[in-house]
Amino acid sequence: MNGDNWGKISDIETLDASALAPGVTKRNVFWAKNGWDDYCARHFILPEGEAIPEHAHEWDHFLISLSGHGVVEVEGERYDLPEGNWARVPGGKKHVFRNVGGGDFTFICIVPTHGDPHAKKYKMRADRAKEKNIEP
């Protein structure tokens, strides 16, 4: 069970991230829905052997590896992300995330609100509702 200011990640709604990779699990931990309007801290579980394909965008990614073993490749350079490591992927750089371990790769990824489709949509609706003086 989650409160307004505390909770278990496993109790947070799972959001559809199937476009990223087969079997990936995504939960938005901190975002506009619970008070962080400018950024979104997302909890991902990337299954063994899966990858989020190469892509680029203008915003940075900030990653913290929680469990398992992943790598991030930035413009062809490979950076190891075993449990407890972190990485920053600069905006504008082509990058890919891979699970290279023997189980799930679990990590936190922080991006600006406009860098997450669920957070962006929620924020737009909340802003519109605020203008109309109604609940989102």
Segments (PLM) and residue ranges:
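A short, N-terminal "cap"/entry segment at the start of jelly-roll beta-barrel domains
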Residues: 1-38, 121-136
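Ligand-binding loop in jelly-roll beta-barrel domains
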Residues: 35, 91-117
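Short, conserved beta-strand element in jelly-roll/cupin
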Residues: 43-47, 56-72, 110
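A generic "binding-loop/recognition-motif" signal
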Residues: 48, 58, 77, 93-94, ...
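Short beta-strand His + acidic residue motifs that chelate non-heme Fe in jelly-roll/DSBH
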Residues: 52-54, 72-73, 89, 95-101
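Short acidic-glycine-tyrosine-enriched beta hairpin
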Residues: 77-91
